[in-house]
Design a protein with these regions (language model features):
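Juxtamembrane regions of bacterial inner-membrane/periplasmic proteins
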Residues: 2-245
């Protein structure tokens, strides 16, 4: 039986489409390989900037296309209060010292918080996942970005110690508009160094991490104040953390 004459051109178009898609995929993979960050270098070197800081600095959040002032000062982990380390861990990632970069418990906690506050669930990322996003990625939730985040998280967990991951995270995470890192936050809100933060102050800073532009020390939000008190209670219960940080 002779095939209808239109089938051959159709097969040819499909073949060209498949080859084109494969070519695009290969080009994307090659570009990722060329631009992929050297994660292992962070074991010894402090990052000079982050994707989130640069995005804010050039007005990327609002498409302003202009330089914006950033408050940021790097300090060693030894100069960051253990109160803040404990507050951030109980608030953001209680399994930080035991997981491999990913945690289903954080996903459950996000849903519980959303139910309590009657709001959409917050992000359920671990500290390591948040660090990968802050250092190299964007706030976008598209699938390719999430895949890249997962790979970078896996690499961070294998290249760095937990203490180093926490040190970098606390130095680059946003604590308010244009305020990055524990030292800048402590000086901006309390006029003191990060090593001198009290339990209450640490809880206030940690409570703002999910929404740093609206939740920060001085915020009158009832949800924020409840979060602060909740973190203080969790810190009191998690006495075992004192031996880890």
């Amino acid at each position: 039986m002779i095939a209808p004459p239109y089938e051959a051109p159709r097969k040819g178009r499909v073949r060209l489409l498949v080859l084109g898609l494969l070519g695009l995929l290969a080009a994307w993979a090659a570009w990722q390989a060329i631009t992929w960050p050297d994660v292992s270098a962070l074991a010894e070197e402090d990052p000079e900037t982050t994707a989130f800081i640069e995005r804010y600095r050039d007005g990327g959040w609002l498409g302003l296309g202009q330089d914006r002032e950033v408050e940021w000062k790097w300090v060693p982990g030894s100069r960051i209060s253990s109160n803040l380390k404990r507050a951030v861990i109980v608030s953001e990632d209680i399994e930080f010292f035991s997981h491999n970069g990913f945690s289903t418990r954080e996903q459950r906690a996000a849903l519980e918080d959303a139910w309590e506050e009657k709001k959409q669930p917050r992000g359920a990322s671990t500290i390591t996942q948040q660090l990968a996003k802050n250092l190299w990625l964007s706030p976008s939730r598209n699938p390719l970005r999430k895949v890249k985040e997962a790979v970078l998280t896996w690499q961070l967990e294998r290249a760095l110690t937990k203490r180093r991951i926490l040190e970098i995270y606390l130095n680059v995470v946003e604590f308010g508009e244009g305020i990055y890192g524990a030292e800048a936050a402590a000086r901006h809100y309390y006029g003191k160094s990060a090593r001198s933060l009290t339990v209450r102050q640490a809880a206030e800073l940690a409570a703002g991490l999910p929404r740093p532009r609206s939740w920060h020390p001085g915020s009158k939000s009832r949800s924020y104040q409840r979060k602060v008190r909740s973190i203080e209670r969790r810190m009191a219960k998690a006495s075992w953390l004192r031996r880890r940080v």
